[in-house]
Amino acid sequence: MYHIFERGCDVMMKIAIWGYGNYGRRMFESLTRFCSEEYEIVRVYDTAYQNLKQTEGEVILPIHNPQELPEDYKNDLFEKVFICIFYASQKPKQFLREHGIPELCIGGPEDLFPLSSFEQGEKPFEIGREGYDFYVIKNLYGAMANYESVEMLYLFDNEGRVVKEHRDHFDPEYFEWFKYPFVLWHSKAEKVFLKGRYCILTKKHSNNYWHYTYSNLEVVWLLEKAGFQGKYVVPALEYGSELLRLLDVPPERIITLNVFEHNKIYVFEEIYYVVPVKPFGDDLVYGSPVLLEAVACIKKKLSLDPSLPKRIYVKRIGKRKLLGADEIIAEYGFSTIIPEKYSVREQISLFFNADIVFCVHGANSTNCLYMRKGTVFIEAFSSYWMNRCNLYALATEGVSYLPVSTLETVRDNKDGVLRDFTFPESLLRITIQNAFLIFQAQHGQQ
């Protein structure tokens, strides 16, 4: 058997890849093109092996049934298995553990370094707000994550040191998500040099509207107020650009991630980075004053439209749906809104105009930030997945908040996060009735 590869070691490790979907194909290409001196891929496995047959590109390997993994490992065909099944890797991990097969993990906490340890540039201004650190970093590298084309750039340097702060601040153990596209230190991947000043807003989870809003709106607000004239790199999703345009950032200063290519390294002349200093305390983590200043700026651009409904039900159509509630909610005069049918600005306007919003918890709940003082927001939770994402901002903004769950005790949350759920009819009705009472009391209605 071969020894584990370490930096500076010239011994290759024979590995197998499990998973040959889009993510697996990109990782296979990265490892065979740029890491051939560190890792030798000798086997590829996928449950769809009968349809896939073999790999594509310069290196051709047959694709095998994952059930063959234990026997192949016993026969010393490979040393470790690299799982390339994103968002569905727990069962494969368990399978490997049960059969005593080591898993290959590319990247870990030892690769993360604070921004203060990178090459510092000259600051043309200061942020001037307590609770934030501000950096200008020179010659920082960026590489697209292979698992999600619209979401993330890794930020690192030529020594393979990854920026510790480049993460979603609500998911601090983010190194577990890192699946480096290639060996980062002294990589052989093609380098593309980008002159000028950049702010990178494509962090982990930036493909989620709530996470993007809460992690990045305050950053843009602070930089714009300080006089930043550089460009922003945003997710290739509508809200990535639209929220910045609502903060008066012109389109020519917004770059969507889809203009970048996989398996290339982008060398940024200067990156401007604003980091919230944690802990703020829960109330500020989930709704800092700076975030709410940015929201207030957006709300000033909105207007009341009498043609829009005053009661809206924001319905989920993917996973974690609220089942069997549509007709009951409609009885109380709610108009059903499916967010996917509206632009970001249209969604924001619907929330701004509504007196009462009934929303199933999810990223679409983010738009409660744009509700008016004295309105009511009902948020429906499955007992498998509850949090305070919107509590503190709503309390500060003067929006009455009615969180409601299925009122069930859940003892095992492993597989329940994405489940659909139901409410007892009596609970659904009393929640809506309470919302009416609160709104009427606030506005002097009988």
Predicted regions and their residues:
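Short, conserved loop/helix-junction motifs that constitute active-site signature segments
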Residues: 34-39, 72-76, 100, 226, ...
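The feature primarily captures lumenal catalytic ectodomains
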Residues: 110-446
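Phosphate-bearing ligand-interacting subdomains
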Residues: 49-114
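Short, Lys/Arg-enriched N-terminal segments with co-localized hydrophobic residues
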Residues: 2-11
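A short beta-strand-loop structural module common to alpha/beta enzyme folds
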Residues: 41-49, 107-110, 335-340
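Short, polar loop motifs at secondary-structure junctions
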Residues: 45-52, 87-88, 237-239, 362-363
